[in-house]
């Protein structure tokens, strides 16, 4: 059995340990994950997926009064159906956190308002409750809505599908998150330079149920690896780890690097984007730099020396761990000599 989201082949022992075989269909479809103990945990939906569903429902409700559910194709390519409440151009969708109990945005309501555009064309307007960048960064200008590229693509695709289905020449859609500013205070946004609301994100469109069960799964995967392992923190890192280290077993560990390293016997590689890796190597890496994020630091003259210093210090502490830092295009930007 293979996870269509991560391409991970579940060991037969995990499948045999599952006491709820009826739930395995959700695992096959990517809607849930299977852990080493046989427990099935539901994936949740990202803020980007929730936003896309609300926008699509608002447009569809212009043509059919009420809308109770919509289909959304996620950035990972999987089509899902979400419950919505749409009526005459306004719709809401509540964020489903799945079995990720620590998701502070779980249950948050996303509201979209749509109106036909007489002049044609499609306009998407991020409104109240969606955060914006308080400072310029290498990828975002000050004041830009905090909506990631995969999430924005998902939203725009859902809007285009709804416009076609509703037979409209165009539309204007305004998306708001009524409690976004309040809930954002419980997230990392205030510390990473995003103000006024939450971020709308979603690399795959799902939220992983990262909890103690997932840690158990990571450790089990490391123990079962037939050879050397490469540990990575995210989806892009997983992709580039497989390309750079095809002979290694690539294992997605999220923010569980410390636990994963303890489970590794022998040599290991850490490969991925700089954010989590540098802060794992040195939680105070930003101290005294005047930067609030690693991405912001990467655009300063301090960057190259900081990367060299932190890699050397980490190598001295963990001589059997090789760290390879890549950018979003897969180029190696940091590696010990």
Curated annotation (Swiss-Prot):
HAMAP family: CbiD (MF_00787). It comes from Methanoculleus marisnigri (strain ATCC 35101 / DSM 1498 / JR1). Keywords: Cobalamin biosynthesis, Methyltransferase, S-adenosyl-L-methionine, Transferase. Pathway: Cofactor biosynthesis; adenosylcobalamin biosynthesis; cob(II)yrinate a,c-diamide from sirohydrochlorin (anaerobic route): step 6/10. It comes from the Archaea. Belongs to the CbiD family. GO terms for molecular function: cobalt-precorrin-5B C1-methyltransferase activity. It catalyses: Co-precorrin-5B + S-adenosyl-L-methionine = Co-precorrin-6A + S-adenosyl-L-homocysteine. This is Cobalt-precorrin-5B C(1)-methyltransferase. Its EC number is 2.1.1.195. It is an enzyme of class 2 (transferase). PANTHER family: COBALT-PRECORRIN-5B C(1)-METHYLTRANSFERASE. GO terms for biological process: anaerobic cobalamin biosynthetic process; methylation.
């Amino acid at each position: 059995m293979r996870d269509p989201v991560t391409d991970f082949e579940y060991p037969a022992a995990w499948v045999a340990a599952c006491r709820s075989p009826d739930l395995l269909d959700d695992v096959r479809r990517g809607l849930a994950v299977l852990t080493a103990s046989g427990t099935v945990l539901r994936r949740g939906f990202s803020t980007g997926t929730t936003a896309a569903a609300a926008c699509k429902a608002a447009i569809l409700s212009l043509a059919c009064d009420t809308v109770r559910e919509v289909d959304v194709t996620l950035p990972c390519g999987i089509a899902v159906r979400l419950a919505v409440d749409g009526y005459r151009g306004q719709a809401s969708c509540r964020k489903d956190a799945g079995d990720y109990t620590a998701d502070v945005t779980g249950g948050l309501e996303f509201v979209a308002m749509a109106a036909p555009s007489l002049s044609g064309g499609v306009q998407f307007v991020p409104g109240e409750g969606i955060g914006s960048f308080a400072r310029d960064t290498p990828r975002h200008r000050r004041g830009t809505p905090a909506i990631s590229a995969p999430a924005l693509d998902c939203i725009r695709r859902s809007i285009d599908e709804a416009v076609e289905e509703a037979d409209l020449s165009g539309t204007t859609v305004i998306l708001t998150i009524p409690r976004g500013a309040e809930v954002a205070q419980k997230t990392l946004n205030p510390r990473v330079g995003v103000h006024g609301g939450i971020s709308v994100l979603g690399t795959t469109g799902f939220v992983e149920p990262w909890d103690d069960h997932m840690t158990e799964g990571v450790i089990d995967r490391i123990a079962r690896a037939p050879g050397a392992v490469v540990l990575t923190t995210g989806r892009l890192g997983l992709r580039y780890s497989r390309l750079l280290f095809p002979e290694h077993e690539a294992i997605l560990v999220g923010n569980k690097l410390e636990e994963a390293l303890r489970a590794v016997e022998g040599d290991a590689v850490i490969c991925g984007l700089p954010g989590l890796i540098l802060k794992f190597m040195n939680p105070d890496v930003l101290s005294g730099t005047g930067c609030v994020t690693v991405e912001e630091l990467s655009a300063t003259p301090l960057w190259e020396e900081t990367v060299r210093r932190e890699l050397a210090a980490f190598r001295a502490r963990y001589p059997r761990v090789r760290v390879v830092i890549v950018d979003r295009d897969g180029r190696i930007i940091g590696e010990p000599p």
